[in-house]
Amino acid sequence: MITTTALVPARRSAVRTLLATVTEHDGVSPLDEAALLALDGEDARHLLLTADGAATDTHAAEATAGSAASADPADPADPAAPADPADPADETLLGYVSVLGDGTVQGMVDPAHRRRGHGSALLRAALALRPDAGVWVHGALEGSLAFLTDAGLTETRRLLTLRRDLGGAQPLPSAPAPTLEGLRLDTFEESRDAEAWVAVNVRAFADHPEQGALTRADLEQRLAQPWFDAEDMLVALRDETLVGFVWIKREQPGATDRDAEIYVVATDPSVQGHRVAGHLMATVLERLERDGVPGVELYVEADNAPALRLYENWGFEVSGRDVQLRATERG
């Protein structure tokens, strides 16, 4: 089995081409933002299934392909682990799985090559690398859930997508004024706010496995994305101390004809209960509505009842589901 933590350009392009094919067929992307960002990094393992029928864990040298069945997977933290040494432009990619450093797994198989055991081969390879893997099914697709359940995995987490229309047909509710003195909203400035933003984010999402683990490097990676627009990132400052923030994501910066996403909204635990989050939400929703954006969506854990009630009061309704499953522990 071939392994690497760094995809060469041709394979990276092949993964993105397969992603477009699968997304169009299934109606939902099988990879989330973290997996997409990992295509350009070196913090994940990439399992590929090519037309020769071999599941390819791209972390060891190409020359080890013939001994895949007996070879131990390379240590992803081993600095001597080689990068993908070839640029196989003539390969046909049938399937792909991303294994992130936190154990998150997500993947896809070409619709034209399903029900041939490819998904099972990729799943076995991923679980061999990370027996504790959390495997995502984006869109909670019935066939994918059945496949993983039959393989012995059980649901452990559910993420909901909520959406609401913007415009006169569904007026925005009025938000009570915040109860903190000296509070003001301002546009995010990296040199001033980045460190405090990360610190507040860690505290606000202490129990969230992905968001709470965000580092300064992770923030900078997202600030460098084409969709980032500083005008869509607001911070709440109390006497110049950052105590909250809201971040809007538009796939095309400045676009007004497509839905926007509440990428993240949070307040420092020390000011929770002072209506700061509601003030941030009201501000960005009113701005998006003025811009003529047709709708807005956000993501929330299905078991977060207080957040669900809050967003329902804001007019949001469930529009999608993502499910994470894990292998059942054997006694």
From Swiss-Prot:
The UniProt catalytic activity note for this protein reads: 1D-myo-inositol 2-(L-cysteinylamino)-2-deoxy-alpha-D-glucopyranoside + acetyl-CoA = mycothiol + CoA + H(+)
* UniProt entry keywords in alphabetical sequence: Acyltransferase, Repeat, Transferase
Ranges of biased composition (kind: Low complexity): 59-86
One Gene Ontology molecular-function label: mycothiol synthase activity
Residue numbers binding acetyl-CoA 2: 265-267, 304-309
Which CDD domains does the annotation name?
Answer: NAT_SF
Where does the chain bind 1D-myo-inositol 2-(L-cysteinylamino)-2-deoxy-alpha-D-glucopyranoside?
33, 210, 249, 261, 299
Q: Which residues bind acetyl-CoA 1?
A: 115-120
Disulfide links within the chain = none
**Gene Ontology biological-process entries:** mycothiol biosynthetic process
Enzyme Commission number(s) from the entry = 2.3.1.189
In terms of PROSITE patterns, this protein maps to: GNAT
Locate the region Disordered: 59-89
Task: Please report the stretch or stretches of sequence annotated as the N-acetyltransferase domain.
Answer: 183-331
Entry similarity comment: Belongs to the acetyltransferase family. MshD subfamily.
As for what it does, the entry says: Catalyzes the transfer of acetyl from acetyl-CoA to desacetylmycothiol (Cys-GlcN-Ins) to form mycothiol.
Q: How does it assemble?
A: Monomer.
Q: Which PANTHER family match?
A: L-AMINO ACID N-ACETYLTRANSFERASE, MYCOTHIOL ACETYLTRANSFERASE
The protein in question is named Mycothiol acetyltransferase
Organism encoding this protein: Brachybacterium faecium (strain ATCC 43885 / DSM 4810 / JCM 11609 / LMG 19847 / NBRC 14762 / NCIMB 9860 / 6-10)
Ranked from the top, the taxonomy reads:
Bacteria, Bacillati, Actinomycetota, Actinomycetes, Micrococcales
